[in-house]
Amino acid sequence: PDIHWHAVHWLEHRGRLACLRCFRGFGKSTILAIYNAWRYYQSHDYRILHQGDQDKTAYKTSRDTKAVLQRHPLTKDWMQLGNARGEASFWWVPGASDERNPSMQAAGITSNITSSRCDEAQNDDVEVPRNITNPEAREKMRYRLGEQTHIMVPGARQLFIGTPHTHDSLYDEVERMGAD
């Protein structure tokens, strides 16, 4: 659909801080996996921190990204020759030169991500009913998101993608900060 073309074009050309609000059923995680694969096709050294509301949902996009790379005609031979090292929580694309920081690190928003480095921090549906039940829970989520500042290298991009679930949504706050 045309809306997906608009989304991938926007993902490529957006600014360093961005927020993509999508309705349920949009396919945002699938679009994000395709975008991630394209980023790795462009640069084997690109590093993504992908965070979801919990580990297992973050791992889905990590696995989807790897599957796109393994199946796409432009990357499947490259992936088969080099064999991406790692597992769903973190892995390196063939040809990545940073041995310490993986190409893809996937984790839940409350997981420990310290000592990592990334060129892009993705927050995919981190705001869900379970973690916004009260002001304290929402503040904890915002605190954990603030840790990304210490992981993102200078010039890194930060993306928030999801569907708002509360009147004082994280996505509203990100847009007030000047996000694309």
Residue ranges and their predicted role:
Residues 1-180:
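Short, flexible loop motifs at catalytic/binding sites
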